[in-house]
């Protein structure tokens, strides 16, 4: 069976609230770590989220 191209990743808030999003990314085209500015409802503002592995 072939290896999956899309990988599930976890985007963790840099505001240290413990809030995270789960999303997918194409591991062949996006080799670097993903960072996004998204809304953190615990901090109640937009902060940067960084990619980590799902355990």
UniProtKB/Swiss-Prot annotation:
<dbReference type="InterPro" id="IPR011332">
    <property type="entry name" value="Ribosomal_zn-bd"/>
</dbReference>
<dbReference type="InterPro" id="IPR018264">
    <property type="entry name" value="Ribosomal_bL33_CS"/>
</dbReference>
<comment type="similarity">
    <text>Belongs to the bacterial ribosomal protein bL33 family.</text>
</comment>
<dbReference type="GO" id="GO:0022625">
    <property type="term" value="C:cytosolic large ribosomal subunit"/>
</dbReference>
<dbReference type="GO" id="GO:0006412">
    <property type="term" value="P:translation"/>
</dbReference>
<dbReference type="InterPro" id="IPR001705">
    <property type="entry name" value="Ribosomal_bL33"/>
</dbReference>
<keyword id="KW-0689">Ribosomal protein</keyword>
<dbReference type="InterPro" id="IPR038584">
    <property type="entry name" value="Ribosomal_bL33_sf"/>
</dbReference>
<dbReference type="GO" id="GO:0003735">
    <property type="term" value="F:structural constituent of ribosome"/>
</dbReference>
<protein>
    <recommendedName>
        <fullName>Large ribosomal subunit protein bL33</fullName>
    </recommendedName>
</protein>
<dbReference type="Pfam" id="PF00471">
    <property type="entry name" value="Ribosomal_L33"/>
</dbReference>
<keyword id="KW-0687">Ribonucleoprotein</keyword>
């Amino acid at each position: 069976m072939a290896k999956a191209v899309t990988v599930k990743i976890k985007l963790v808030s840099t505001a240290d609230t413990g809030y995270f999003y789960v999303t997918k990314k194409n591991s062949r085209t996006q080799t670097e770590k993903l960072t996004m500015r998204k809304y953190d409802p615990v901090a109640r503002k937009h902060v940067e989220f960084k990619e980590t592995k799902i355990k």
